[in-house]
Amino acid sequence: VSAPFEPGEHALLLDQRGRTYLVLLQAGGTFHSHSGTLAHDEILGRPEGTRLETANGMVLTAFRPLLSDHVLKMKRGAQVVYPKDLGPILMFADIHPGARVLEAGTGSAALTIALCRTVGESGKVVSYEAREEHMEQARKNLGGFFGKIPDQLQLRDGDVAEVAATGERFERCVLDLPEPWGPLEAIHGALEPGGVLCAYLPTTIQVQQLVLELPHSGFLHIQTFETLRRGWHVTERSVRPDHRMIGHTGFLTVARRLA
């Protein structure tokens, strides 16, 4: 059952033109936009899907935000992995409840959030980030989404190659690094035989170097692909593709660890 909105949680406000706004609700707070002002108290205590009028007479509809809404509107230290790529990563890296996942490149934590939600409380995510400023923003974004750093997540400052010294073992590894071929030896040692490695890379040069290195580092069944998202405009009179589409954001390279 969907509970009424409470102070301290986020609401997604949808205006009549389809624009969305992510708002942290506070008693006595006020939302300001081109659509006018709306007191947070008008939202608090009401269920999702409630339609409200601003001081200018514009209608806003309040929903709880989806993960994709958080990702698109979160503050960024590093470039985020977009929703159109998050889904394929979770699918092709075979992230499942209870999985032990190694992540390198926490960045703004969009992918980290998706991993933590998918593995659940019975799973484990260990995420490395070499840049202090990115880790600081990641912690804020994780706290904003979960309310705290989730119990199944360990955040570590430093290079993912340091995992070799821990003796830990993982079933899956997800990389968002500019040079993912560098720590392959350490990652091979940390992955279980048959484990999945999935790397997110923006350029073909990076992909080529990684794919050429993977067989020499104990990986096989290598696949590379990208996902494109094209929206459609549907009305009574016509059905046509949108004038704009979300094209290239990054490539995914997936491989399996040999014994």
Predicted segments — roles?
Residues 96-107:
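Conserved class I S-adenosyl-L-methionine
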Residues 128-180:
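S-adenosyl-L-methionine
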